[in-house]
């Protein structure tokens, strides 16, 4: 039985980390694509040479040809320009939109049956454009954002409560940006909702508010510290979690940028919502009920994404 084929489009920091994780977890064979000659080949060879020590048999190949991704089961897209200090995710729009056109056409022509996970920023607009350019079914194209944002939220909460991260559940709604909506009401520690933990004296509303804001600023915090790029370890592990759910038909409940068709009041666009990921791709969107305050924050985030999508249409007339 052939191993799954996983195409990684972009061999930068996230792409290289993804390739290593795929090999370590033995999720499949890897094709690492990048337009920079030598970079994907070098990283693929370096990771392959760690196989004898790590004990994996995955095959890794670096390439500049989309023909090599033919028949891929999963495509994870990281191609594009990363953020640098002082840049917002939205500043990347024009540059990375052109990249998504090239990538979308490459996937359309060579791996039309793949499950596609986009990581390129500004995420919600880029995954929308990628689906448009590729023509793949919307349930087979999604964006990695909510898993990462939720992981950051869970990390900060576990630190605050001094408990295992395994016992913290949390999810983040909305666009992958400053308007994201970390859901306090739907987040728990061992099943105990965060508002109840305030009543129990475990924390205060002020501390939770600060954690929510730090979650929103999570990417910028790392950009500011690194100074030469953006996060890559946590984004890569988040995308692997999604890919594994698809490849193993795990039916995982994971927040991600998915195409909404009326869920949570959103129609005809991608935004961060809780989903079920299995062998059918995005098999279901969980239409959670929101309070008026939560809905207002979510709508504000959706409107920010709409603005970026409209900007994409203005840049590339084929999207209008």
Swiss-Prot record:
Catalytic activity: (S)-malate + NAD(+) = oxaloacetate + NADH + H(+)
EC code: 1.1.1.37
Entry superkingdom: Bacteria
CDD domains: LDH-like_MDH
Residues of the active site: 176
Keywords: NAD, Oxidoreductase, Tricarboxylic acid cycle
Binding site for substrate: 83, 89, 121, 152
Record-annotated disulphide pairs: none
Binding site for NAD(+): 10-15, 34, 96, 119-121
BP GO terms, sorted: lactate metabolic process; tricarboxylic acid cycle
Record keyword Oxidoreductase present: yes
Organism in which the protein naturally occurs: Ruegeria pomeroyi (strain ATCC 700808 / DSM 15171 / DSS-3) (Silicibacter pomeroyi)
Family of this protein: Belongs to the LDH/MDH superfamily. MDH type 3 family.
Function field: Catalyzes the reversible oxidation of malate to oxaloacetate.
UniProt-recorded name of the protein: Malate dehydrogenase
């Amino acid at each position: 039985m052939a191993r799954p084929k996983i195409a990684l489009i972009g061999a930068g920091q996230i792409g290289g980390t993804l390739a290593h994780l795929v090999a370590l977890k033995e999720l499949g064979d890897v094709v690492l694509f990048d337009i920079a000659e030598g970079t994907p080949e070098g990283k693929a060879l370096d990771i392959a040479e760690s196989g004898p020590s790590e004990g994996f048999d995955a095959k890794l190949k670096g390439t500049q040809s989309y023909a090599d991704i033919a028949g891929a089961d999963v495509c994870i897209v990281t191609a594009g320009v990363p953020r640098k200090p002082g840049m917002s995710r939205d500043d990347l729009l024009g540059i990375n939109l052109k990249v998504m056109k090239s990538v979308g056409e490459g996937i359309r022509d060579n791996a039309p049956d793949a499950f596609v996970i986009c990581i390129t920023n500004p995420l919600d607009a880029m995954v929308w454009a990628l689906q448009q350019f590729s023509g793949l079914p919307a349930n087979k194209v999604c964006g990695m954002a909510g898993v990462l944002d939720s992981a950051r939220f869970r990390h900060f909460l576990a630190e605050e409560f001094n408990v295992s991260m395994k016992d913290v559940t949390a999810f983040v709604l909305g666009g992958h940006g400053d308007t994201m909506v970390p859901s306090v009401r739907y987040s728990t520690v061992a099943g105990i909702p965060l508002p109840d933990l305030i009543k129990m004296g475990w924390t205060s509303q002020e501390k939770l508010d600060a954690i929510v804001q730090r979650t929103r600023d999570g990417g910028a915090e790392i950009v500011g510290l690194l100074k030469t790029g953006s996060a890559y370890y946590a984004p890569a592990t988040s995308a692997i979690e999604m890919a594994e759910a698809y490849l193993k038909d795990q039916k995982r409940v994971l927040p991600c940028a998915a195409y909404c068709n009326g869920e949570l009041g959103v129609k005809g666009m991608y935004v961060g919502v809780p989903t079920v990921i299995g062998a059918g791709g995005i098999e279901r969107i969980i239409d959670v009920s929101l309070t008026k305050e939560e809905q207002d924050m979510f709508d504000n985030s959706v409107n920010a994404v709409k603005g970026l999508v409209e900007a994409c249409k203005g840049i590339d007339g084929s999207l209008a």
